[in-house]
Amino acid sequence: MKMSVNNILQDKRRWTTFQLIAFRISFVFFIIISIPNNPLWYKHVFAIDWLNLDYRDLYDICRFGSGVNWFGRTTFGHHLQGYSIWVNTLFFSVAAGVLWTAFLKLRKRERYEYDKLFYWLNVIVRYRAGLGIIGFGFTKLFPVQMPYPSLGILDTDYGDLTAQKIFWLSFGIVPWYQVFAGILEVGAGTLLFFRKTVPIGAALLVGALGAIVVVNFAYDGGVHVYSSYFVLLSLFLLIPYYRPFYDLFVREIPAKVSLYLPEFNPAFHYFSVGLKAAALFIFVGVFSYLQYIDFRYDPYKQPSSAGVQELRGQYNVTEFKLNGETRPFNPYDTIRWQSATFEKWSTLTFRINKPLRLDLSNGGGDPKRDVNRTFELSGVAGGQRAFHYYADTDNQMLYLEDKYKLFPDPRNVTAGEGGDRGVRNYLTDRTLNDESPAISLEEWMPDSVRHKFADEVNDVHPKARTTRRIREFAKADELAKKETRKRFVVNYAVYDNGNKVILRGVDENRDSLYVVLDRVVKDYKLAPGKLVAGQYD
């Protein structure tokens, strides 16, 4: 297949009326879906500390909401599986295209072609698709998007996992496959920066992201709209290549691609080359380093704080007392713990035979506080509970708070509006009274102890102490005072070289609690490899 570039005034051809109207509609549509529709995005860009970047700073530049949302997020009352904003944008674009055509006819200023405008529209779509998929791909290239299953998840029956969770865990157990997918996405995005490699990059995105769309529909994955977004942009970029591809691969005859390229003066040419080089340096070079730091020290779906070393592992609950009353093992007991796990990070999970509200998120978003990172809880049923804990190792005390939230954090929103700073887990007029915690925040952790954990923002490797993390914690600490969480406190004692753990304390209902845990070693047929996120030793 041969590619030729036509300069201004060369090989000018007259577009058909259909092509002119279709372009006007397409121009409005793709411009709208290629630029941020939320003022908070622009506020975020100007607030970035470029001397102390967090990976999420660049990620939020690459990922943003777009489209016409002035009429809400429904079309005639229907969400359309999340595509309603696209449909509303299309309606708006059709109306704008018709008005554009009518205006030109009234002014008798008919155009015969839009070669130059089509060129610049392609540039905008190329860079939008390229930057977006690079941000998306780095979370796979350094595998943090789909973590390896935690001990609590491994202790969960297969039937108690949602379809989405099963799919994500299927990726999580093969991190090198995630890496391959990340290389594909980042590589395809990089190819879109260069005009001659656009068809390769766009074709790769159609194939890779098209498969992700199908899988997300099959497993209720939740990112089908965003994946479809890149498929749509890539299909648009391939428009000049459809006929040549057909000639080459179907008719098996020589094919020629004719692309329009305006003539630029030398100054503009050097400026554009410099701009492209800067974009590649920041969004490929710097971004890859920042994503590695996140993978190595602060994976965004896993807590960053290390758990108590001597507690880590899986346990059978051999003795359980509530208010001094022994509750023998009974699989139908709705109060007694059935099993328990201490993760390598600061999370305790245990199972009870009681239906609980299910967290249907994918555990993502951008929270910096460990208690708001819920991947080990999201999509997990079977009475599984997960508690983040603060460990006072001097006095062997654990201060635990429930990781489940009535209102999950909004996903994929601009910094400061989601994750920790957008916590909506507050008491409201609509919140049921019986959801109020029996132990208040002040009772749970008195001031005499709280000062030991006041420096939580720095409880991470120095390279991960970004300005964004500091800002998020500053606001999150204030909002945490309004949260509605179940909390309890226990003293822990370790015996028999760590094979037995005894917990004594008060649970979230102010009942005295006494639990004896015996360590158990389970022979799973899979084991984590060397490519493991986080640093917990």
Label every model-predicted segment.
Residues 106-107, 111, 239-279:
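Cytosolic-side transmembrane helix boundary signature
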Residues 36, 147-251:
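Hydrophobic alpha-helical segments
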Residues 70-92, 174-183:
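Individual transmembrane alpha-helix segments
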Residues 111-136:
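Interfacial segments of alpha-helical transmembrane regions
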Residues 30-46, 56-60:
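Alpha-helical transmembrane segments of multi-pass membrane proteins
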Residues 127, 131, 263-297:
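Internal/C-terminal transmembrane anchor helices
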Residues 310-537:
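Extracytosolic and intramembrane catalytic regions of membrane-associated proteins
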Residues 139, 284-312:
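Hydrophobic alpha-helical transmembrane segments in integral membrane proteins
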